[in-house]
From Swiss-Prot:
Lineage: Eukaryota, Metazoa, Chordata, Craniata, Vertebrata
Family, per entry: Belongs to the protein phosphatase inhibitor 2 family.
Region (Required for binding PPP1CC catalytic center, displacing metal ions and inhibition of PPP1CC catalytic activity): 147-150
One GO BP annotation of this record: glycogen metabolic process
Subunit structure: Interacts with PPP1CC.
PANTHER family for this protein: PROTEIN PHOSPHATASE INHIBITOR (PTHR12398), PROTEIN PHOSPHATASE INHIBITOR 2 FAMILY MEMBER B (PTHR12398:SF27)
Residues recorded as bearing Phosphoserine in the entry: 44, 121-122, 127, 130
Compositional bias segments (type: Polar residues): 17-26, 182-205
Residues bearing the modification Phosphothreonine: 89, 92
Region Required for binding PPP1CC: start-end pairs: 12-17, 43-55
Protein's UniProt name: Protein phosphatase inhibitor 2 family member B
Length: 205
């Protein structure tokens, strides 16, 4: 019986039948139309941005930021009045020397504008501070001016170096003259009698 049942069944080959492939092609043609949206949704990710913002960047989170109170740098920006001064400097090339000399003589006694503005602005800021804070701020600004005045420091350093070198030269000259005098006295002592040597010692002391 086993042989009879095997003969009734058709033998299947490895290759697909033409009828099965055409039916699958018709089915697959209908599927892409429906599944294009499904495939795109599978391949792409949708982000819930509101949820991400709420999770990672909440409104009450401080991020560890803190306010830093630093003193203002000693930089003096040019104000509106100084723009005219810049224009004047551009035209100085065509200006006559005598006119320039008159302007310099007139401006010699005046204090620079940025210093005047700095003093006015510091007066406004100091009114909000307590006396202790004003004194502390004044001392700080004084120390900062000393620190940033490098030109003066360089001049002082050069003067000190030249003074040290001059002192060293004088010391060397004094040593040379002292050595020369001692050699002269020794030479004179060699040619003299012991009584003359005693007299020279008494004179030198």
């Amino acid at each position: 019986m086993a042989a009879s049942t095997a003969s009734h069944r058709p033998i299947k080959g490895i290759l697909k039948n033409k009828t099965s492939t055409t039916s699958s092609m018709v089915a697959s043609a209908e599927q892409p139309r429906r599944s294009v949206d499904e495939e795109l949704s599978k391949k792409s990710q949708k982000w819930d941005e509101i949820n991400i913002l709420a999770t990672y960047h909440p409104a009450d989170k401080g991020y560890g930021l803190m306010k830093i109170d630093e003193p203002s740098p000693p930089y003096h920006s040019m104000m509106g009045d100084d723009e005219d001064a810049c224009r004047d400097t551009e035209t100085t090339e065509a200006m006559a020397p005598d006119i320039l000399a008159k302007k310099l003589a007139a401006a010699e006694g005046l204090e620079p504008k940025y210093r005047i503005q700095e003093q006015e602005s510091s007066g406004e800021e100091d009114s909000d501070l307590s006396p202790e804070e004003r004194e502390k701020k004044r001392q700080f600004e004084m120390r900062r001016k000393l620190h940033y005045n490098e030109g003066l420091n360089i001049k002082l350093a050069r003067q000190l170096i030249s003074k040290d070198l001059h002192d060293d030269d004088e010391d060397e000259e004094m040593l040379e003259t002292a050595d020369g005098e001692s050699m002269n006295t020794e030479e004179s002592n060699q040619g003299s009698t012991p009584s003359d040597q005693q007299q020279n010692k008494l004179r030198s002391s």
